Amino acid sequence: MTTPSRIVTPERRVDDVGDTALRPQLLSEFVGQQQARANLQIFIDAARKRGEALDHVLFVGPPGLGKTTLAQIVARELGVGFRATSGPVIAKAGDLAALLTNLEERDVLFIDEIHRLSPAVEEVLYPAMEDFQLDLIIGEGPAARSVKIELSKFTLVGATTRAGLLTNPLRDRFGIPVRLNFYTIAELESIVTRGARVLSIGITPDGANEIARRARGTPRIAGRLLRRVRDFASAADKSAIDRGIADHALSALEVDAAGLDAMDRRYLSTIAMNYGGGPVGVETMAAALSEPRDAIEDIIEPFLIQCGYLQRTPRGRLLTSHAFKHLGLAEPARDAAQFGLFGQGGEEG
């Protein structure tokens, strides 16, 4: 199984084009992230009243929490144009210059995965963000000359899942940093209920709760699960999704009551059965699962760590008692030293 195909991956999938209709259009419709939403509303209202461009905004958080949706909402609330791109797409300074020179006054430019901008592109972006100017070098060698281009005052909205990879000069140019957190089950229930209404299918409170509990704190996953559960309900001639049909559908999709899928359980079972619960190195796990190390560290492990099933220790990955209980296995006797200093572990290389 390749990780992008997992129904519970927080990364965007090809079939997620169907979630566009489920996205809120205004801040008042956006569920969750209460403090971030309240602050954004104040900053937007203030910029609109002054007739100025909003300060540059940086959204930081795991994938699937609504960074792109919030960027679109910011532009809509400001009543300005919206242009979207991503860090890997902007290959050279000229690509960025083309985007910036086509922006109107106060427009929003959204750059997803902004941590993946090349250093050469970043250098061009600094004066654009700070002084609304482009400093470009035209030509090569002795004939090269510097050209300064004035830009319309715009708002750059950046999004990143890995804030630690941002350079300090780039991070410091964002006046409004916003960190997004995982959603509560109650918030996801509201999102699922609204989504069912948009999809024109009924849903009971316990049906919404069943989907929300397995959505791993992530609206994108909740929307994806809702669409698949709706298919099961339609096939069974059900006019509404209740707990029974939700449980049946999600079990058929191999998403268990804790939100773990077959890959998660395979990961935990491999450590439990083959390595006595650990510690085991990440390279060993990558080979055992036939998955790249990056996929292990960035896609599989974060949710398992968040739920308390896994520890990263200096000696390797280690299952917790919670993991053995979830797998229905007896926990082997282990030396306390395996857990690292005071039971906490640093990153194992």
Curated annotation (Swiss-Prot):
Enzyme class per UniProt: hydrolase
GO biological processes: DNA recombination; DNA repair
- The EC number on file is 3.6.4.-
Q: Which UniProt keywords apply?
A: ATP-binding, Cytoplasm, DNA damage, DNA recombination, DNA repair, DNA-binding, Hydrolase, Nucleotide-binding
Q: Where is this region: Large ATPase domain (RuvB-L)?
A: 1-183
**Keyword Acetylation part of the UniProt annotation:** no
**Which Gene3D superfamilies does the annotation name?**
1.10.8.60, P-loop containing nucleotide triphosphate hydrolases, Winged helix-like DNA-binding domain superfamily/Winged helix DNA-binding domain
**Which GO-annotated molecular functions does the record name?**
ATP binding; ATP hydrolysis activity; four-way junction DNA binding; four-way junction helicase activity
Q: Write down the SUPFAM superfamilies for this protein, in alphabetical order.
A: P-loop containing nucleoside triphosphate hydrolases (SSF52540), Winged helix' DNA-binding domain (SSF46785)
User: Can you tell me which residues bind ATP?
Assistant: 22-23, 64, 67-69, 130-132, 173, 183, 220
Q: Where does DNA bind?
A: 293, 312, 317
HAMAP family per the record? DNA_HJ_migration_RuvB (MF_00016)
Q: Indicate what this protein is called per its UniProt record.
A: Holliday junction branch migration complex subunit RuvB
Taxonomic path: Bacteria, Pseudomonadati, Pseudomonadota, Alphaproteobacteria, Hyphomicrobiales
